[in-house]
Amino acid sequence: GKAPNFLTTILSNPLGDSFTFSPLVLHGNVPLLPSTNNATGWGVGAKAVGRTTPSDTGWSNQITYTTPSFGGLKANLHYQFGEQTGANDSKKNIGLNAIYMAGPLTLTGFYERDQIMNPAAPNVPLTNTRKDWMLGGAYDFTVAKAFLSYGQSDEDNTNAKAKTAQVGASVPLGGGKVLASYAQTKLQPVNQSRKTLTVGYDYNLSKRTDAYVMVMNDRITSYESGNSVGLGIRHRF
């Protein structure tokens, strides 16, 4: 099932759940380097701190409770069993999110306490408990829709922190939309930063089919910047 961070993330940025071009998703959920590079904070594995939400966008073996909607406000409570033995048998993930929608306004946020890293078979215990949260929102001005989010991850027993801010916009143009999003993540205490900008255009060919082109620039401390270009056609079944 979906992790607490998933809905908050996709509602707070104009590129939704794109794991290729959404700066917010890339900074929050996608590791950059092999585990041998964990010293920089950008790797994968139990010691990596470069992601705001290291437990991924999906939690297996979880229980979720969804509240009724109260005037546009709804919340989801999550509990994931850790499936660990021995010294790690008490480890688990817990979290919640809340979503408020009223007319052109969307407000959302999540909180997670992560002790298990997803996805993995079996799930891998994190070296230290991680506490992650994000606040985000969007407002549709008709001529443009604005997006904003801020999130932070803290490790217990260390000074490791990841702080991510993102701003974006979606502007109707012709038969589609111009999409733009910028995210910046700062790591402490290693003083590393990542800055990602994506600009693109998504054109509706029909109700279920669209064509898109995206350009992305990615910059990381101590590494050469990278540029990516993508284009494609998407059909929803």
Write out the residue ranges for each language-model feature:
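Secretion/assembly modules of Gram-negative surface proteins
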Residues: 66, 200, 236-237
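Short loop/turn motifs that connect adjacent beta-strands in outer-membrane beta-barrel proteins
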Residues: 71-72, 174, 206-208, 223
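Detector for outer-membrane/organellar transmembrane beta-barrel domains
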Residues: 89-198
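C-terminal closing repeat unit and adjoining cap/tail of repeat-based domains
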Residues: 197-215
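Transmembrane beta-strands of outer-membrane beta-barrel proteins
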Residues: 1-3, 76-80, 108-112, 147-151, ...
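Outer membrane beta-barrel
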Residues: 1-82, 90-92, 99-106
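A short, acidic, flexible beta-alpha connecting loop/helix-capping segment that sits on the rim
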Residues: 117, 153, 215-221
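Outer-membrane beta-barrel "beta-signal"
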Residues: 225-237
